[in-house]
Amino acid sequence: MMIVIMLILSYLIGAFPSGYVIGKLFFKKDIRQFGSGNTGATNSFRVLGKPAGFLVTFLDIFKGFIVVFFPLWLPVQAEGPITTFFTNGLIVGAFAILGHVYPVYLGFKGGKAVATSAGVILGVNPVLLLILAAIFFGILYLTKYVSLSSIIASICCVIGALLIRDYILFIVSIGVGVLLIIRHRTNIVRIFKGEEPKIKWM
């Protein structure tokens, strides 16, 4: 029972709509009505500006990071292969990612999984996150497309999981990668049409 509570709590924390709350609290704006209509970090930068964008990014990363440690902090017991699987920090983190993308507080319409996924990886493998961040910002510098950089970094995460033989990370990264591509499908279409907006701060 405690494992179920832990996973629900992880989802609810992940579902906290940082961009929406910051927009409403400090700018009196519903971020869903501006830009891409997304509540995540990228749209927060576009609509609310750099300081708010960085704050939203931090909060979204923190959501993923903090829940990874729930199996250590909460009184959960793994007594078999199934409970062991669901008390793995990566699996707990995956529920936070689902919450971020499909938040119950906003009618299940949230962000695109990038920052919260980064927080989960930070909690379980900081070195891998550094490598993925270098790839992300390298692609971003060359293309100026956040969406493309995110997709390529997610593919590299799958490859990295195989190289280090972390098979739970492999499973989670494939799931998140598919989710990320689904959430960025309109961005992909706009890239091919040459209509995807490029960042201007790099």
Swiss-Prot record:
Subunit structure as annotated in this protein's UniProt entry: Probably interacts with PlsX.
EC number: 2.3.1.275
Name of the protein described by the UniProt record: Glycerol-3-phosphate acyltransferase
Top-level taxon: Bacteria
GO molecular function: acyl-phosphate glycerol-3-phosphate acyltransferase activity
Family: Belongs to the PlsY family.
Enzyme class: transferase
Catalysed reactions listed for this entry: an acyl phosphate + sn-glycerol 3-phosphate = a 1-acyl-sn-glycero-3-phosphate + phosphate
Pathway it works in: Lipid metabolism; phospholipid metabolism
Location(s) in or outside the cell: Cell membrane
InterPro entries: G3P_acylTferase_PlsY
NCBIfam families: glycerol-3-phosphate 1-O-acyltransferase PlsY
Major localization listed first in the record, in broad terms: membrane
Its biological purpose: Catalyzes the transfer of an acyl group from acyl-phosphate (acyl-PO(4)) to glycerol-3-phosphate (G3P) to form lysophosphatidic acid (LPA). This enzyme utilizes acyl-phosphate as fatty acyl donor, but not acyl-CoA or acyl-ACP.
GO cellular component: plasma membrane
